């Protein structure tokens, strides 16, 4: 991938050793109850420990991300983002590897707008605790990681996907400013990793849609089509955490109650934006969690929720134009919608596939291969319309 102008900066990276010692000292004071609860919440996920095939890569990513976040802590961006911020490439040289941070000031501002403290971000992604791996049902060859607290999701990307993401980044940021309660997954960082003189590998950091995951009972990846959209469910009693697909959802509905109209409108706004970007093959992630009796209804937190939900809007009219809603009093509130009986985790992910020549040829081949059946490779307009129709048909 060609480095955007004005060209990369290269600096020696600070060491995360002091931060690792502090985090290890803090973690040593956690009690038995906390550790048991942590183990239960991670049922079906796998710690990337010594001996795991991805352990070395994980250690390099952790050390690199710790140092990269330290830069934004030492030099926090001010003012509005500039063209130079969007094109900045900062390369930090470590012993045996280099980690690049692309458009770092832009993502630092985005993290700050979400109320995410850089110290918390650094601690979660740094070397204090191992990442988690899960068995993905995706057909891509990407590697997937979760921070140990499952708050952040890391995924490897191809260079052309990174190019598309960075090309769309100014419009992505603008869309989130216009629609602060958008369902689009929040990308928090884009990085490259080069070991010794090897080839660069790219990865992104995102907020996990499925957080907090402790009581989630079902997970789905929805594209609104049928070809290759079935996953064999885990056997009864299995600890595997599987993300199921469209055909697994047949006969089910999402009961959002009064929130349904907001959800349908936000899907229209977000898919229209992705259509304008000429993007397709994105997914609606969904997960279910049954609400406890004391969690149903706004309750005593209504004033707090209302204040947080309208913060940043200048008027009721502006709030309506932005399609804001009453956010739940919960972590990761932007991706959580409460229905009468269930809490739903909802988000649009995988926003980097552009409808170019490669996808047009793939669409032609699939039309011949699967006559009369629906598949994911269609024009962005058709893709957006079909996914919105699926949502309307499966919500109440």
Curated annotation (Swiss-Prot):
One of its GO terms (molecular function) is ATP binding. It is found in: Cytoplasm; Membrane. CDD domains: PIPKc_PIP5KL1 (cd17304). The keyword Cytoplasm applies. GO terms for cellular component: cytoplasm; plasma membrane. InterPro entries: PInositol-4-P-4/5-kinase_C_sf, PInositol-4-P-4/5-kinase_core, PInositol-4-P-5-kinase_N, PInositol-4/5-P-5/4-kinase. Its main location: cytoplasm. Residues 38-395 form the PIPK domain. The keyword ATP-binding applies. It holds the Pfam family PIP5K. SUPFAM superfamilies: SAICAR synthase-like. Residues 1-24 are annotated as: Disordered. It catalyses: a 1,2-diacyl-sn-glycero-3-phospho-(1D-myo-inositol 4-phosphate) + ATP = a 1,2-diacyl-sn-glycero-3-phospho-(1D-myo-inositol-4,5-bisphosphate) + ADP + H(+). GO terms for biological process: negative regulation of mitochondrial membrane potential; phosphatidylinositol phosphate biosynthetic process; positive regulation of apoptotic process. Its EC number is 2.7.1.68. Keywords: ATP-binding, Cytoplasm, Kinase, Lipid metabolism, Membrane, Nucleotide-binding, Transferase. It is an enzyme of class 2 (transferase). May act as a scaffold to localize and regulate type I PI(4)P 5-kinases to specific compartments within the cell, where they generate PI(4,5)P2 for actin nucleation, signaling and scaffold protein recruitment and conversion to PI(3,4,5)P3. Heterodimerizes with other type I phosphatidylinositol 4-phosphate 5-kinase. This is Phosphatidylinositol 4-phosphate 5-kinase-like protein 1. It comes from Bos taurus. The lineage of its organism: Eukaryota, Metazoa, Chordata, Craniata, Vertebrata.
């Amino acid at each position: 991938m060609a480095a955007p102008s004005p060209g990369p900066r290269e600096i020696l990276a600070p060491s995360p050793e002091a931060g690792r010692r502090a985090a290890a000292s803090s973690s040593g004071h956690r009690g038995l109850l906390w550790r048991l609860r942590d183990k239960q919440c991670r049922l079906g996920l796998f710690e990337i420990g010594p001996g795991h095939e991805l352990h070395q890569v994980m250690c390099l990513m952790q050390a690199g991300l710790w140092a990269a976040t330290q830069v934004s802590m030492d030099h926090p961006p001010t003012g509005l983002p500039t063209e130079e911020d969007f094109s900045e490439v900062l390369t930090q040289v470590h012993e045996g590897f280099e980690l690049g941070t692309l458009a770092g000031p832009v993502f630092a501002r985005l993290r700050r707008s979400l109320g995410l403290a850089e110290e918390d971000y650094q601690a979660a992604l740094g070397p204090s605790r191992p990442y988690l791996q899960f068995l993905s049902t995706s057909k891509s060859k990407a590697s997937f990681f979760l921070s140990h607290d499952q708050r952040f999701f890391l995924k490897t990307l191809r260079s052309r996907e990174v190019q598309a993401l960075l090309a769309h980044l100014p419009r992505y940021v603008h869309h989130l400013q216009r629609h602060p309660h958008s369902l689009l997954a929040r990308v928090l960082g884009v990085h490259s990793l080069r070991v010794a003189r090897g080839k660069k590998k790219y990865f992104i950091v995102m907020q996990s849609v499925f957080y907090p995951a402790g009581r989630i009972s079902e997970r789905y990846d929805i594209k609104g089509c049928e070809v290759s959209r079935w996953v064999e469910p885990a056997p009864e009693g299995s600890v595997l955490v599987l993300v199921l697909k469209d055909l697994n959802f047949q006969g089910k509905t999402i009961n959002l109650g009064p929130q349904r109209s907001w959800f349908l409108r936000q899907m229209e706004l977000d898919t229209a934006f992705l259509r304008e970007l000429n993007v397709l093959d994105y997914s609606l992630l969904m997960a279910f969690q049954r609400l406890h009796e004391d969690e149903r209804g706004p309750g005593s937190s209504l004033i707090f929720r209302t204040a947080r939900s309208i913060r940043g809007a200048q008027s009721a009219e502006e709030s309506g134009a932005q399609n804001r809603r009453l956010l739940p009093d919960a972590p990761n509130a932007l991706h959580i919608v409460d229905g009468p009986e269930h809490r739903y985790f909802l988000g649009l992910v995988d926003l980097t596939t552009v409808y170019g020549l490669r996808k047009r040829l793939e669409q032609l081949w699939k039309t011949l291969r699967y006559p009369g059946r629906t598949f994911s490779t269609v024009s962005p307009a058709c893709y957006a319309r079909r996914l919105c129709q699926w949502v309307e048909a499966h919500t109440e």
